[in-house]
């Protein structure tokens, strides 16, 4: 059920087909044996319920996903968060087993897709790993353990004393730190404020921004949390936090998915 405070972008699509959004899949093995692709339901619900679009999962596997054909089919793309990290060879760093798992098939799709979306003006929204992929696609680098940099907080998800993930999603996705937005920037304008508070569930983070990557928001400890791609003809924003968490009620995440939905309608109208 859509929260009553959410302005339903789907109302704007009455009498026309809803925009279609490609949501990237992540590699997963059922019982550690059977290869599959999966997407977290929160991502799908955010696209459907707040952006007002039809979510369509596509494989994060270059042997399956033809990027040109995909972009001829969808009106926008969401690069979701994922457990696997971007492989360090994409930004000239040696891999290490403590930073595994990696998903190089998704890397191959997401990096090429980021450039293709921007080149074609197709709305692109990167979340957590998706922000990192956008940065690497445009020549940037990542640090595999942000918490090891001087003065940085631990941005990883909360865990129990035994190391297991906390079972309560309200604890896992609780707002944990502020993000200061660039005055007059895209995010400050979109959200109508200078400071927001967000969740934090990541180990890697941006070290060096890519050539066209514009920093739009920074955490209290200096970690880059929001970006846009300079001179992109369409929506091309990325966030380090998990904006897919409860955008039906969270005003910051809701505003982002609504803006993405509006960009989809505008892009669809130009098609």
Name each model feature, range by range.
Residues 194-197:
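Catalytic cores of DNA base-excision repair glycosylases
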Residues 131:
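The feature captures the ABC ATPase H-loop/switch
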Residues 237-240:
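Active-site-proximal beta-strand elements of phosphoester/diester hydrolases
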Residues 233-235:
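A short, structured beta-strand/loop element
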Residues 1-125, 135-143, 147-191, 203, ...:
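N-terminal beta1-alpha1 cap of cysteine-dependent amidohydrolase-like domains
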Residues 128:
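Conserved G/P- and acidic residue-centered "switch" motifs that form tight phosphate/ATP-binding loops
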């Amino acid at each position: 059920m859509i929260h009553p405070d959410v302005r339903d972008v789907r109302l704007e699509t009455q009498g026309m087909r809803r925009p279609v959004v490609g949501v990237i899949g992540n590699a997963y093995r059922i019982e550690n044996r059977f290869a599959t692709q999966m997407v977290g339901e929160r991502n799908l619900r955010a696209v459907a319920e707040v952006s007002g679009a039809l979510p369509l999962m596509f494989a994060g596997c270059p042997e399956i996903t033809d990027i040109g054909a995909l972009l001829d089919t969808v009106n926008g793309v969401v690069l979701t968060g994922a457990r696997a990290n971007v492989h360090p060879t994409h930004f000239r760093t040696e891999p290490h087993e403590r930073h595994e798992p990696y998903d190089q098939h998704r890397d191959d799709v997401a990096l090429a897709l980021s450039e293709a979306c921007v080149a074609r003006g197709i709305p692109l929204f990167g979340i957590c790993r998706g922000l990192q992929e956008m940065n690497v696609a445009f020549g940037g680098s990542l640090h595999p353990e942000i918490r090891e940099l001087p003065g940085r907080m631990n941005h990883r998800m909360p865990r129990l004393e035994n190391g297991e993930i906390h079972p309560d999603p309200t604890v896992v996705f609780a707002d944990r730190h502020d993000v200061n937005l660039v005055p007059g920037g895209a995010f400050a304008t979109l959200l109508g404020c200078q400071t927001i508070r967000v969740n934090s569930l990541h180990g890697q983070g941006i070290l060096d921004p890519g050539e066209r990557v514009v920093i739009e928001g920074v955490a209290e400890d200096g970690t880059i949390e929001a970006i846009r791609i300079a001179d992109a003809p369409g929506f091309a924003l990325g966030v380090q936090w998990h904006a897919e968490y409860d955008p039906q009620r969270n005003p910051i995440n809701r505003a982002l998915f609504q803006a993405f939905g509006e960009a989809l309608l505008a892009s669809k109208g130009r098609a």
